[in-house]
């Protein structure tokens, strides 16, 4: 449509849109045919509320009231994003999200629910394996063994 060409926002005419939808920096926003968007939802640039191509009938997400979807996030399939939730920028959400949750990552994971952080080993990023340091440590160990062997 002409509006989509001017704004970069594509909303299928079959989508159901609630009151107070706010699309900030809307270029690249896509809302699919069977999507349902609740009241007071905020979408940032590059958001896709799309299908996975595997379903018939209802194949796009339902976004409940007061949800914020960060830039570049993809919410795909016949899933529900619960009220008062936040989807982090760049996330790919393929499963239902409970109300009052924060989701980040690829695939999207709930990291906060009802304002309480969810502990997860997957979320600790300060103890990630470093293959280069592992190789250096192996070399150091080998050198130490060789030096000890030569001293004997």
Give the ranges of each region predicted by the language model.
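C-terminal segments of enzyme domains that contribute to small-molecule binding surfaces
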Residues: 58-75, 106-152
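Structural signal for interior beta-strand "rungs" in well-ordered beta-sheet cores
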Residues: 4-111
